[in-house]
UniProtKB/Swiss-Prot annotation:
Organism: Aggregatibacter actinomycetemcomitans
Localization annotation: Cell outer membrane
GO molecular function: porin activity
Keywords, in A-Z order: Cell outer membrane, Ion transport, Membrane, Porin, Transmembrane, Transmembrane beta strand, Transport
Chief place where the protein resides: membrane
Gene Ontology biological-process entries: monoatomic ion transport
GO cellular component: cell outer membrane; pore complex
UniProt superkingdom: Bacteria
Name of the protein in its database record: 39 kDa major outer membrane protein
ATP-binding as UniProt keyword: no
Amino acid sequence: VKVYNQFGTKVELGVSMRIF
């Protein structure tokens, strides 16, 4: 997935990757 911001709130597949 491609993270558009440093907070990981918006990814390409919409996956919850809020591990920052």
